[in-house]
Amino acid sequence: MINPTEVNSLIRLLDDPDNEIYDHVHEKLLGYGTEVIAYLETAFEQAFDAIQQERIANLVHEIQFSTLKNDLKLWHQSGAFDLLQGTLIINRYQYPDLDDQKVINQIEAIKRDIWIQMMNEASPKEQIKLINHVFYNIYGFSGNTSNHLDPQNSFLSQVLETKKGNQISLAIIYSVIAQKLDIPVYGVNLPKYFILAYLDESRESDFESGIMFYINAFNKGLIFGRRDVDMFLKQLNLKFDKQFYEPCSNTDIIKRVIRNLISAYENLGSAEKVAELNELLNILG
């Protein structure tokens, strides 16, 4: 239980010029975890001293980043079963105060609009055509071709707001919605491109022959076949590798999201963010 008087007294000492006192106060406040953030934010608004403001902001970020790392570690160690949860954890890196339920509700709304129109006997391609119609035509999602390196393309909440994303963020939303509708669509970690596969569930144990077709979520849900993947790999001078054709793990998907963010922030020259994102990448092995 936090003692407000003690916490506020510690916060007032954050601008102390004595480094030993500052280090002690910093560690003490850090130990409170997320409970102390509300007090720090109030103090930030009331602070006139630039050093104190900077130290408060850094401390808030440190607490939030530490919590994010712990949550990502727990998600990974628990089996990484929920792709949406993993994506929301990464989203908190840039938007720590966002209510996850808001994002979940947005995805549920899209799912519901598809479900209402879905026929029980629809074939796999008919199912995908309906998802494409609702996702791209009604909701207006599209690939961000004009600013592909923008880090916002990788943050789920922003993609849902702007309706623009990169290959992997659009594929994540698409596959999460499909799976909520019991449609077997999963991510495939193709080099330089992230695609989706529609599985023939009766042959799920053998992914290579159990894939009915592939889907390009970045290009309005375009359906294509194995030969197209063969040709793409040939253009890249890459030899056959089963992993380029088969669904990958949720951990692999989140690692790719983080790598995209690292590239985006390297492009912007944000060394601190690159270092922190590498920490997140290391958690996933």
Give names to the regions the model predicted.
Residues 1-285:
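A structural boundary/capping signal
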